[in-house]
Amino acid sequence: MQSNMQLEPNFWQTKSLLEMTESEWEALCDGCGKCCYRKYIQGRGKRQKLYYTRIACNLLDLETGKCGNYSERFNIETDCTKLTKKNLPDFHWLPDTCAYRLLYEGKTLPEWHPLISGSPHSVKNADILIKNGIHERDVIDWFEFIIDEDHTFK
């Protein structure tokens, strides 16, 4: 997430995701860190379900929701996936609070989003961060840490 000092006001309302600059694209991230929590897929076909867990990437700062080494994350965590304008349609697993997903679905940003509130602390203040996260290196049984099963693959 970047500072929005050099960004056009309300750019997310006037530009499509494809029209955004790299700075605007990065500024959309609210810093909740939910995309850095592990997901578990069970079943196949129409019965395939996605489960969200409290298991975080080892680089995630559990208190702030920020990556501990953002610039090198792809070199350190081999399964870290870069969200881009081209692959966004493949990221149906993003949380329903994610700005990228919301804008892709034609929805508005929530009041607590830093671009709306003007505060980088609004995500934490709105209680959006996952509580009681645990790093992947400290987990033996993933099933103990499932927190949601709200998605069925299409």
Swiss-Prot record:
Pfam families assigned to the protein according to its UniProt record, in alphabetical order: CxxCxxCC (PF03692)
InterPro entries linked: Puta_zinc/iron-chelating_dom (IPR005358), UCP006173 (IPR008228)
Protein family: Belongs to the UPF0260 family.
Record NCBIfam families: PRK05170.1-2
Protein name: UPF0260 protein HI_1355
Organism taxonomic ancestry: Bacteria, Pseudomonadati, Pseudomonadota, Gammaproteobacteria, Pasteurellales
